[in-house]
Structures are given as C-alpha cells and as structure tokens.
Amino acid sequence: MLTAEEWVRQNIILFLHKDLKVPVSHIAVEKGFKVKGLSKRFDIVVFDKKGNIIILIECKSPKIKLNQKSIDQLVIYNLELNASYLMLSNGLKHIFIKYQNGNFEIIDDIPVYSKL
C-alpha cells in the first residue's frame, strides 16, 4: 500500500516522464546527501545528459500545506545540489522555482526536458 507521499512521488514521476519528456534513466528517487554535515534525503531529482542535477523535487502528503517552511527546506537542499529548477508538490498544488545566479524566482511551470 502506498503512503500519501509515495502516491504524490509516483504521480510526479509520471508527470516528469509523460509531460516534460524526461527519460526515466535521468530520474533518481530518494537518495542521501549531506547539507552542512547533516544527512538529508531528496525525494526526486532529474539529471541532464552530463549527469548534473537540473531539477530538485520535494514531495509532501496531500494533507500537508505548502508553505514557506517547505520552500525553505527545498532551498536549503539546493545550496548543496545546485539545481536550476525546484519543484514542491503535495499532489494538489505545485510550486515551481527557477534558480539562477543566486536568485530564486517562482515561475508558472518547468520547461520540457529538451529545453533545459
């Protein structure tokens, strides 16, 4: 049985593959990394053809409201991972963020994979 967060994660993977045309081989799920010496775990990342992380995604349960605390968590993770795009989703609402030159900007959507 899927947890609520896992249901969101599986649907985001489908969105990445079907809508954004991300090759499945360029998607990684739940891998550990360190932020300032602390062990953390991302939900989903997308790699470019050179193996660089270009999209960092944090999934929440549909019961969790997306708020500034959730965005801050994603931004802190990105200090280490340095993705160009961030996505936060609870399956009901999605927030897309572009990261460029040290600035974060909320955007309407993430471009298809071939445009990244």
What residue spans do the PLM features occupy?
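A short, conserved, highly charged catalytic patch centered on acidic carboxylates
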Residues: 1-85, 92-116
